[in-house]
From Swiss-Prot:
Keywords: Endoplasmic reticulum, Lipid transport, Lipid-binding, Membrane, Mitochondrion, Mitochondrion outer membrane, Transport. Residues 73-113, 186-268 are annotated as: Disordered. Residues 1-435 form the SMP-LTD domain. Component of the ER-mitochondria encounter structure (ERMES) or MDM complex, composed of mmm1, mdm10, mdm12 and mdm34. A mmm1 homodimer associates with one molecule of mdm12 on each side in a pairwise head-to-tail manner, and the SMP-LTD domains of mmm1 and mdm12 generate a continuous hydrophobic tunnel for phospholipid trafficking. This is Mitochondrial distribution and morphology protein 12. It comes from Aspergillus niger (strain ATCC MYA-4892 / CBS 513.88 / FGSC A1513).
């Protein structure tokens, strides 16, 4: 189903101007964080304009919002009571089952001294563990993990990897789209004892934040983050106070690692973010978006000339983005008084709505405009396919420019525009608007 957008009403007026200024300021701030090459001194973003050509939207599906959209922000001004905060698995255990935290469920720990009491003051849950929180309350001896294998051999641990830093083929969106309770990890808040109830959660990376480039192997786009540095959970047979050596083959083999884990002052422990409660009126729209408009972005970059000496003089290069060609899948989720917006990568879009057949005519036109002929122009989630730009360098004298079209600077600036767009607007990153 296709829909029409009143582009003029949506992008004009005081609200439209304020949104354009926020986008300009956001892109400008991102450029200040970029490591510039030696021949560029600075990059400034001066203006942003939405243009007059609206995008073409076709609704593909209506579904439940992604689990990441329910994460509670640290700076959120909304009341915790009104938002109905619940644990990561979506069940308000703290409010409806207070008896699960009573001491009657902790008395059995005296039977086996090698088991670490999960309700002691110094215990902090691991980022990866077997997802049996309710059984931990009812029977602490149930989790008898395999010695030497942190967290046991349960394959459910695969679903507990945080999705906040993965995208494309690394994101199991089939589970996320269905609102799977394992989509964003498991909350161990239900195991917190009375001494830990009033302790506020420390900051944690959420889906709003992008991954540092240093954590990603750019040479291998399908590589996953290494799990060698992940903090393991304590096996049920290991305890720092157990001196019989029966805690598994890794007991005592890494004393510095165990000392690091048992020292609460060594590093701030990770905790899962709080989640808002799902409501029946929450919904999400997946739509195929096409755009070949006249959005404008004005930038200036100062180029350094090294003759006759290094950084001898700087020349201002003005770049005007006069339009873009876009083809992707947009996600719009409405949750209470918030609208969450993002785009999907090509792999995630194919997994959710399927891939369309390539358009030969569009692919030919894209190749003529300078795009890669081996890449289909109708890549679902391909996002920015073309950026049209005009450049001027130096001051104009008698209507003539000093130089024209400095290719290196153009390629660098446009590559950064693409990177900022895809890192900040492609799931798991998203923008939230209050309505």
């Amino acid at each position: 189903m296709s829909i029409e957008v009143d582009w003029g009403a949506a992008t004009s007026g005081p609200d439209g101007e304020a949104l354009a200024e926020r986008i300009r300021s956001f892109i400008h701030d991102k450029f200040q964080q970029v490591a510039l090459p030696r021949f560029i001194r600075s990059v400034q973003v001066h203006s942003f304009d939405f243009g007059t050509i609206p995008p073409e939207l076709e609704i593909k599906d209506l579904c439940e919002p992604f689990a990441d959209f329910y994460e509670e922000d640290e700076d959120d001004e909304a009341s915790d009571v009104s938002e109905g905060l619940v644990s990561r698995h979506g069940s308000p255990w703290h409010g409806t089952h207070p008896e699960l935290n009573e001491s009657s469920f902790r008395d059995d720990n005296a039977i086996n001294h090698s088991l670490r009491d999960p309700f002691t003051e110094g215990f902090q849950p691991s980022a990866l563990r077997s997802p049996i929180a309710l059984s931990d309350h009812l029977n602490p001896h149930f989790r008898s993990g395999t010695p030497g294998i942190p967290g046991g051999t349960s394959t459910l641990g695969y679903h507990l990897m945080s999705l906040g830093g993965l995208s494309g083929t690394q994101t199991p969106l089939a589970a996320v789209a269905g609102g799977s309770p394992f989509a964003g990890g498991w909350n161990d808040s239900g195991m917190m004892g009375p001494g830990n109830r009033g302790r506020p959660p420390p900051p944690i990376f959420t889906a709003h934040q992008s991954r540092p480039e240093a954590d990603i192997d750019s040479s291998n786009p399908t590589s996953r983050p290494s799990t060698s540095s992940t903090l393991p959970s304590h096996p049920s047979g290991s305890n720092k106070n157990n001196g019989d050596g029966a805690g598994g083959p890794d007991h005592g083999s890494h004393p510095e690692e165990h000392g690091h884990l048992d020292d609460p002052t060594s590093e701030e422990p990770l905790r899962f973010p709080r989640m808002r409660e799902r409501r029946p009126e929450d919904f999400q729209v997946l739509c195929h978006a096409k755009y070949a408009g006249d959005v404008r972005l004005s930038l200036t970059a100062e180029i350094l000339l090294d003759y006759p000496m290094p950084s001898f003089v700087g020349l201002p290069l003005k770049l005007n983005v006069t339009g873009i060609t876009f083809d992707g899948v947009a996600v719009v989720a409405y949750i209470r008084k918030r609208v969450h917006f993002c785009f999907l990568s090509s792999e995630d879009a194919d997994a959710l709505i399927g891939s369309d057949q390539p358009d030969v005519g569009a692919q030919t036109e894209y190749s003529r405009s300078g795009g890669d002929a081996t890449v289909s122009a109708k890549r679902q989630g391909g996002l920015l396919q073309e950026i049209r730009v005009e450049s001027e360098i130096g001051r104009k004298e008698d209507g003539k420019q000093v130089l024209k079209n400095v290719g290196k600077v153009e390629r660098f600036v446009l590559a950064q525009v693409r990177r900022i767009f895809e890192e900040e607007l492609v799931y798991p990153s998203f923008w939230t608007f209050l309505v």
